[in-house]
């Protein structure tokens, strides 16, 4: 399965921590909720539920030339793909390859998921 998705928020901006009274909670940020909705829309109504061991190739096209750690977008992206129903859990992934490509306006990621 191949998908072209918007550039995801980094792991540093994916979750937010809130304290209500004495209780602390970790919630998805607004950026993360919007990104998940975009991934679900790109996958479609009936996603293929892959059940075996998986390989994932991610091509990252950053929105600008700022220095970024490309591993900071892996976890949010993989979680969103699982939430969209591509696979049951990202623990199914045995092979993961991430490459940084040239900058494009707005940024994007191209994801290929294959069964091994």
Regions flagged by a language model, labelled:
Residues 1-116:
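Acidic, proline/glycine-enriched N-terminal capping motif
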